[in-house]
């Protein structure tokens, strides 16, 4: 596929990410202009995966230390904010709300939402990175 067609696909994909609220446009556009969007997106994918894995381990313990889980959720919220993943950030905030009132069931439901939204962000960012790699393989503009 020609570089121009790949760029068009990339732009359409990123526009869809904005339209669906996967990433916040202003934040992500600033990162793209700075040339750091892809690097930060890779960090988000890796760090968020590790954090979610740590949360899963803690949630499987017989006595869940919800304070530890809340601290990990705060870390995840910071990661999500770095690339403008507002839906993930909001889901983390919902967890915090349930944590404040000590509602374990609400915490569990909100963690499921966090995981699902993270998967959406991860998949969309991976598609974006694949398109960028294909464009780079086409050579200079």
Over which residues does each language-model region extend?
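Two-component system phosphorelay core
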Residues: 1-141
